């Protein structure tokens, strides 16, 4: 083969891994991105678990207001923030059937574990489960859609 092309030398130069800095950077950068994405997914999972545990911590129901319902003992405004209820508001309903904005009720229950209107205790789930094992489970509230 060298006789066909006498002026050309067809030897491949010896290139070691040390002479390819771009490959090293690609591997390191790719690994760093992979670890970053994994840690981001793990953080999102932990945040989701925290929100789920926070929802289940108190024994109130979460509903989305579709229309005015008399059975829920709804007043025209939230007793915590004093704003009117609007359609599609997320409501928290205490066992005593008093309704509040969900965020208002969460903030209230972090300070006091009672209904803002009637001071009836809003039990934590551990206490509620022991009582529900003896009685029949409650169905969804009329006129309201449960949030999943």
From Swiss-Prot:
Entry keyword Chloroplast: no
Pfam families membership: zf-RING_2 (PF13639)
UniProt-recorded Gene Ontology molecular function terms: zinc ion binding
Record-linked InterPro entries: HRD1_E3_ubiq-ligases (IPR050731), RNF24_RING-H2 (IPR048025), Znf_RING (IPR001841), Znf_RING-CH (IPR011016), Znf_RING/FYVE/PHD (IPR013083)
Membrane listed as a keyword: yes
Transmembrane segments: 24-44
GO cellular component, one term: Golgi membrane
Topology of this chain in the membrane: Single-pass membrane protein
First-listed, main subcellular location of the protein, grouped into a coarse class: Golgi
Subunit details: Interacts with TRPC1, TRPC3, TRPC4, TRPC5, TRPC6 and TRPC7.
Described purpose of this protein according to its UniProt entry: May play a role in TRPCs intracellular trafficking.
Protein's name according to its UniProt entry: RING finger protein 24
UniProt source species: Homo sapiens
Lineage start: Eukaryota, Metazoa, Chordata, Craniata, Vertebrata
């Amino acid at each position: 083969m060298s006789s066909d092309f006498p002026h050309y030398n067809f030897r491949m130069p010896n290139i070691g891994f040390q002479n390819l800095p771009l490959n090293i950077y690609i591997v390191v950068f790719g690994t760093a991105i992979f670890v970053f994405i994994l840690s981001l997914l793990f953080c999102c999972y932990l945040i989701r678990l925290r929100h789920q545990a926070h929802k289940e911590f108190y024994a109130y129901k979460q509903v989305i207001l579709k229309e005015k319902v008399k059975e829920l003992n709804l007043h025209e405004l939230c007793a915590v923030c004093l704003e009117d209820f609007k359609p599609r508001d997320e409501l928290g309903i205490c066992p005593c059937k008093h309704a509040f904005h969900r965020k208002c009720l969460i903030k209230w229950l972090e300070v006091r574990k009672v209904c803002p209107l009637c001071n009836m205790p809003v039990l934590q789930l551990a206490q509620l489960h022991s009582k529900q094992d003896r009685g029949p489970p409650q169905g969804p509230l009329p006129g309201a859609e449960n949030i999943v």
